[in-house]
UniProtKB/Swiss-Prot annotation:
Keywords: Cell membrane, Disulfide bond, Glycoprotein, GPI-anchor, Lipoprotein, Membrane, Signal. Disruption phenotype: Increased anxiety-like behaviors. Increased glutamatergic activity in response to nicotine in layer V neurons of the medial prefrontal cortex. Residues 1-20 form the signal peptide. GO terms for molecular function: acetylcholine receptor binding; acetylcholine receptor inhibitor activity. SUPFAM superfamilies: Snake toxin-like (SSF57302). Interacts with CHRNA4 and nAChRs containing alpha-4:beta-2 (CHRNA4:CHRNB2) and alpha-7 (CHRNA7) subunits. Pfam families: UPAR_LY6. It is found in: Cell membrane. InterPro entries: LY6_UPA_recep-like (IPR016054), Snake_toxin-like_sf (IPR045860). It comes from Mus musculus. Preferentially expressed in the nervous system. Expressed in embryonic and postnatal postmitotic central and peripheral neurons including subpopulations of motor neurons, sensory neurons, interneurons and neurons of the autonomous nervous system. Expressed around the growing nerves in the limb bud. Expressed at high levels in specific brain regions such as the prefrontal cortex, amygdala, hippocampus, mediodorsal thalamus, dentate gyrus and specific brainstem nuclei (at protein level). Believed to act as a modulator of nicotinic acetylcholine receptors (nAChRs) activity. In vitro increases receptor desensitization and decreases affinity for ACh of alpha-4:beta-2-containing nAChRs. May play a role in the intracellular trafficking of alpha-4:beta-2 and alpha-7-containing nAChRs and may inhibit their expression at the cell surface. May be involved in the control of anxiety. Glycans are attached at N45. This is Ly6/PLAUR domain-containing protein 1.
Length: 141
């Protein structure tokens, strides 16, 4: 029961007037062949307090690499990325990888020669965030 109390407290903090949270992401809703949608014309402002993450989907096909990027809610993004995890084999034909991140323009081009991105959400954290989101929803039902 104390978990719901904590969840309600966090909900109150995030939904206070004046504390609107908005993130910018790269967005190309239709798959783009060999175009990673990372130029300025693909930058969009996501829906305030609803779409709090950026999502990137990469499909490797015989014709080339297909990209789709968008804003997403944390729940939708985490569910999609977890659902496709078994299909993600970078460098292999028909691989489908979906990743989520929560910093501005984080679904854009990869940084040159650096380690893994600190903003990328790790698989163990996916479950924690999903359960936290469910607790928040239960607190408001």
């Amino acid at each position: 029961m104390w978990v719901l109390g904590i969840a309600a407290t966090f909900c109150g903090l995030f939904w206070l007037p004046g504390l609107a949270l908005q993130i910018q992401c790269y967005q190309c809703e239709e798959f783009q062949l060999n175009n990673d949608c990372s130029s300025p014309e693909f930058i969009v402002n996501c829906t305030v307090n609803v779409q709090d993450m950026c999502q990137k989907e990469v499909m490797e096909q015989s014709a080339g690499i297909m990209y789709r990027k968008s804003c997403a809610s944390s729940a939708a993004c985490l569910i999609a990325s977890a659902g496709y995890q078994s299909f993600c084999s970078p460098g292999k034909l028909n691989s489908v990888c979906i990743s989520c991140c929560n910093t501005p323009l984080c679904n854009g081009p990869r940084p040159k020669k650096r380690g893994s991105s600190a903003s990328a959400i790790r698989p163990g954290l996916l479950t924690t965030l999903l359960f936290f989101h469910l607790a928040l929803c239960l607190a408001h039902c």
